[in-house]
């Protein structure tokens, strides 16, 4: 798959989707995007900046949702233009899809909406690459149906069918908890789409703080290393310079000051994993 000018797949180094969970201010986004661009360039990691203009699924109705679509897209457009980095944002409605597709390079669908057929069809027909998140309630093999829906919708419009990624972000495990079954990353390869691992939402404790979600950010490196050892096309990680005071998903965000060290480890591990190949492909023979 070709994504934002670079090739992605299990025969290529992983690419990174990263940035703050939500757009808090223009300056914060510019600072984080600039820092991430510098770090990833030094490590040879293809990079896509992400942030949300509207967090439409916050735990509480009083939680900060973002600057809104118009202002948020203006900020993302500025980052794209001035820093020359591709940008990704998530969409929640068909109106979001139409407007965001005019600005960003990649669209992302929320995990909660992966079974909404009309929504998946609409985003697939946007003409943009799409990172489709697996629902916390969905078995890994069921993502094939989701990807197939997207491909069929793209095909109807004469659009490329290889524009979709399948993203793992953990599975519900009782109340207020998620687990990551690493077998799922291998199973999701059966979709034929590049597999992305969301290492930060996978350590979220949904609704675990009453009116907001908790998280275990110290477990992000653990799961990220595991995913890279399994073999993935890309990684998704939210990061913030001050996670304890972030306006959304701070408990599971990577402190920006630690991103370089974490990525250095992951690059080394990714190289070993992909150099030696995937023996599991031969075990059924």
From Swiss-Prot:
Family per similarity comment: Belongs to the KdsA family.
GO cellular component: cytoplasm
Places the protein is found: Cytoplasm
Protein name: 2-dehydro-3-deoxyphosphooctonate aldolase
Keywords associated with the record: Cytoplasm, Lipopolysaccharide biosynthesis, Transferase
E.C. number: 2.5.1.55
Signal peptide: none
HAMAP family for this protein: KDO8P_synth
Principal EC category: transferase
GO biological process per UniProt: keto-3-deoxy-D-manno-octulosonic acid biosynthetic process
Gene Ontology molecular function, alphabetical: 3-deoxy-8-phosphooctulonate synthase activity
Cytoplasm as UniProt keyword: yes
Pathway: Carbohydrate biosynthesis; 3-deoxy-D-manno-octulosonate biosynthesis; 3-deoxy-D-manno-octulosonate from D-ribulose 5-phosphate: step 2/3; Bacterial outer membrane biogenesis; lipopolysaccharide biosynthesis
Reactions performed catalytically: D-arabinose 5-phosphate + phosphoenolpyruvate + H2O = 3-deoxy-alpha-D-manno-2-octulosonate-8-phosphate + phosphate
The keyword Transferase appears for this protein: yes
InterPro entries (UniProt xref): Aldolase_TIM, DAHP1/KDSA, KDO8P_synthase
Family matches, as Pfam families: DAHP_synth_1
Record organism: Paracidovorax citrulli (strain AAC00-1) (Acidovorax citrulli)
